[in-house]
């Protein structure tokens, strides 16, 4: 499609050697695969719009996949903070006497109705042919938080880019795809 061709002008797709099988740590049949970019939107309608603009995508369960991109989505918040009772405070169970509870890092737990969606996104994130993850959640603090909670829960270690969408027109989506922002640039939104 024109969006794919435009984004790949003058660029070679990332490639990574992958071992099909190994025996005592030695690769028997090494092969090179083209790495894909996983785009995670905040809601299904946005994922559909992005997939439509990219073009050449096939619906595969609850995500879209093409030669270069996979487009999946959350359903808003998939995780929430664990209840205070889940934290061990001062060698005992939580009580009001222990307030405020300020652990170094808050634990997350899946929202029951969204647990399956989180599990499916985790599978996409861990795919060996996914080289980069793009945050296409809503532009703003809330969208940034939704995405970062997903990354934290799935223990994602892959490079992250930000698709900053302020409009859902095909032209705006194409423009944002050509101007992906770095994860470092978006860090202040998460704090």
What are these regions (language model features)?
Residues 19-20, 27:
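Cysteine-centered motifs
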Residues 24-25, 32:
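Mature cores of small secreted peptide/protein domains
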Residues 1-2, 7, 22:
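Serine residues within intrinsically disordered or low-complexity segments
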Residues 31-191:
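Intrinsically disordered, low-complexity regulatory segments
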């Amino acid at each position: 499609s024109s969006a794919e061709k435009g984004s790949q002008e003058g660029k070679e797709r990332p490639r990574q050697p992958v071992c099909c099988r190994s025996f005592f740590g030695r690769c028997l049949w090494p092969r090179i695969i083209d790495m894909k970019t996983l785009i995670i939107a905040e809601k299904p309608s946005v994922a559909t719009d992005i997939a439509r603009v990219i073009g050449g995508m096939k619906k595969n369960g609850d995500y879209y996949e093409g030669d270069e991109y996979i487009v999946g989505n959350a359903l808003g918040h998939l995780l929430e903070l664990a209840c205070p009772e889940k934290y061990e405070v001062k060698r005992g169970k939580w009580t009001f006497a222990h307030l405020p509870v300020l652990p170094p890092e808050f634990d997350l737990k899946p929202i029951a109705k969204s647990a399956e969606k989180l599990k499916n996104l985790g599978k996409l994130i861990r795919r060996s042919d996914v080289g980069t993850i793009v945050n296409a959640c809503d532009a703003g603090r809330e969208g940034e938080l939704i995405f970062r909670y997903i990354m934290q829960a799935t223990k994602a270690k892959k490079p992250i880019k930000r698709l900053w969408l302020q409009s859902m027109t095909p032209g705006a989506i194409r423009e944002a795809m050509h101007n992906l922002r770095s994860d470092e640039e978006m860090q202040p939104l998460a704090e």
